[in-house]
Structure formats: structure tokens, C-alpha cells
Amino acid sequence: MVSFVHVISVESNTAEIVDSVKMSGHPIHKAYLIFDSEESKKYVDEVKGTLSSLVEVEVLELKSDGVYEAVVDILRTVRKEVDAGNTVLFNITDSDKLTCLACFISAQISESKIYTKKGDSVIEIPTPPIKKVNEDKLEILRALEREGGSVDSINKLIELVEGKLEEQKKYMAQRARMSYHLNGLEEDGLVVTERKGKNLSIFLTELGKAFVAMFG
């Protein structure tokens, strides 16, 4: 059976959060409470106390000040729910700017719904569709992540992805294929490249790391 999982940001308004969940029009089987400040812990405990008598509740503290670092943390948590076939809903009723933006990006990447309470009603906020990344490009992103986020040459990346460099004729095909994929990844903002002498260094961007967290 599909479970409905609510990812709820918590800042300082327990009553609004609880009301928004009740008014969302969706069932709730599990909740993740996310927060990013010491001051919010009190309200996290209050919301947890209310919801835990009804559903399973987990808490996720976002410890970074960066938006994409927060997105990676959220997606690593959300991914297991999506992979299990569950429906994920983001509730940004009580969000500061960073958490709100991180939730919006996470909802977009994971193709989840996002809602908020506005006055006496709850509204769903549409997110634009995100461009799909094929398996060949995902494997490049995974390889960069395994290497700590960067490699110092295309040859190194080919070795990581394909296992070895082929002889001259096949090698040229390998290099052309890798260059083609890297151009697409760079256009999508998932990697950046930098020429260093004869070599081309490749770096995973923060958005690229978020894709690996969700799809890698």
C-alpha cells in the first residue's frame, strides 16, 4: 500500500503546522520534521508530540547554511520513500527562506508535491518539470561523487566510468562520447570544467550533488 509521507519544515508556529496537515486533504502515514536552527527545536518537539501519537515521526536537522547542502540532506532522506513507491508531500507553511527554497528545489527534483497554508485554506504550489538525466550521464555524476567531486582529466573520468582506456581507434570514440556527455551536463549546470594546460578538469556542482543524492 502506498504511504503518504509529509516533509514538514518547522520554525516557530506549531498550531499553523498542525492545522495545515489537517487541512491538506491528504492522508498522513509518516512525517519528517526538518529544521535549521537551535531556536526551532522547541517547536519541533511540540509538533512531534502532537503527530507521534498518530503517525511515525522522524526529525532531520539541516546543519549547513547553504541551500544545496540542505537539498542534498533532504533528498537523501526523501529518496528512500520515493524508491519505496510512497507519495511525498512537502509542507512549507512554517519555513524560513533557506528551508523554503531547499524544500522547493527538493520537491522539484524528486517530483513531489508541495503545499502551504494561506489564511483559512491550503494551496498546492506547482513546481516546473525538471529535465531528465539519462543513465550514461548519471554514471558520470556518480563517478565524480565517488572521487570527492572532481577529476583532473577526461581520461581519468573515462577510466572511472568505463573501467579502462581502449586502443587508439576505440579510445577516440570513448573520448568523443565522454566530451558529448560532459557538454550536456555542463549546459544543465551539473558539472563545470576548467582547462589546466593540456588537461580538462571536471567538477561536480552543488546541483550535480543534489542529483546524485536523489538518482545516483
Curated annotation (Swiss-Prot):
- Enumerate the InterPro entries for this protein: DUF6293_C, HFX_2341-like_N, WH-like_DNA-bd_sf, WH_DNA-bd_sf
Superkingdom of the source?
A: Archaea
Q: Name one Pfam family in it.
A: HFX_2341_N
Name under which the protein is recorded = Uncharacterized protein AF_1987
